[in-house]
Amino acid sequence: MVKKTRPAAVPRLFGTNGVRGIVNSREMDSQFALKLGMAIGTFMKGRVMLGTDARTSNEMLKSACAAGLMATGCDVLDCGVVPTPTLQYAVRTDDAAGGVMITASHNPPEFNGIKCIDSDGTEMSRASEETIERIYAEQAFSRASWDRVGRLVPHTNVIDRYVTDIVSRVDAEAIRKAGLRVALDCGNGAGSLVSPKVLERLGVKYVTLNSNPDGAFPAHNSEPTPENTRDVVELVRAGGFDMGIVHDGDADRTVFIDETGRYLFGDRSLAILAYHMCKAKPGSLVVTNVASSRCVEDAVRMAGGRIMLTRVGSPTIARVMKEYGGVFGGEENGGLIFADFQYCRDGAMAAAKMLETVAKNGKLSKLNDEIPSYCQFKTKTPCPDEKKDAVIRRLADEAKGLKVDTTDGVKILFDDCWVIVRPSGTEPIFRIFSEAKEESKAKELAERYKKRVESLVKA
């Protein structure tokens, strides 16, 4: 009798948002980019859009990845330095087989990454990533004959088309009439090439900070956290601006500062925009993840809309929106998805929509204050990957009799607060988020469950 053997486990390359690593380490050097490009080309089989953010290592990695793609017979359309959503727009509107973005998004400058885009412009599904990982691991590359090797073709008009399409999807006349003033911080990233053009086309007066592409990120790290947005907050407070707009490195995310200098976390922006979309079209479906603030659900229900909660991750939210007809979605990190434009996070589109909302409804601080507010607390604790499932099962068992949501990890809902314990998909840790009306209660709840997780890990 022949004994069947399981296929060998394939090492995981793709994390939540592509493959990332420190430049010129084994995880992210030119040899890796070449072979991964061959694996991607073997899978995609057609015209591939290729773009980069503003990082210093982009030309090296782009050249290697492009060589790999062409070796499999794919024609590569080089879009140059563009925001990730601009590349996604190019893939979708120019009938490409897929796209490859060289970016590490908000990571520090010594990092870079490679991200794959499906033919419909959405972030690649995990199933497709697993296929590419297997091709890479087995070196099962398609190799084109000498007369079928792909070509590298410049594709330089995508930014203008993208900007024009964004402007056409908001009430530009209302924005112009409002006479808005904006402080714009592009974080020295790819958004520097797009968002100023959007503001100009909308007739917005603006002042820029850090809006020249510079892969060293000299002003601040490209993650738009409260700590990294202090300069724009001070400018808004001092300069009489209607809002501040801040992008991450590849401009798929946007956070906003209101006219008083108050930083709005992404779920506040999500709640504000969701409220006004649902008010305009009652019954609209908004999609967010189970770790988002309750303020999003409150805002949607106040406006007569419907809400659906998913696992954490923008690809999941986008696909649920597409399947169930969601009009809008997003997450706490400032990644907002507008179904009437494209099913991916889009920082420039988010900026245009918020400008339209403020122009029609009043000051951003007022819109924010109209939405119920809660206090959140976030922490994390180490856990070996092999123990994560057992810890989650135990927590779910212990919560029997309570209101529990196991969409992503374990979320336990009480009358006036909640806590979620969810395993990271890329690190050996648990993330623990809590929310309550009082900051002290949110902190106590998160710390209590952190201690419980730590005891279960040790058991």
Regions found by a protein language model. Give the residues of each.
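Active-site nucleophile and cofactor-binding loops and adjacent substrate-binding regions
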Residues: 76-85, 263-266, 288-289, 310-311
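Gly/Ser/Thr-enriched, mixed-charge loops and adjacent short helices
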Residues: 2-9, 22, 112-239
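Phosphate-binding and adjacent anionic-ligand microenvironments
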Residues: 243, 279-459
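Short glycine-centered, acidic/aromatic-flanked micro-motifs in structured strand/loop junctions
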Residues: 51-53, 184-186, 258, 340, ...
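An N-terminal, well-structured beta->alpha segment
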Residues: 1-67, 71-73, 97, 151-182
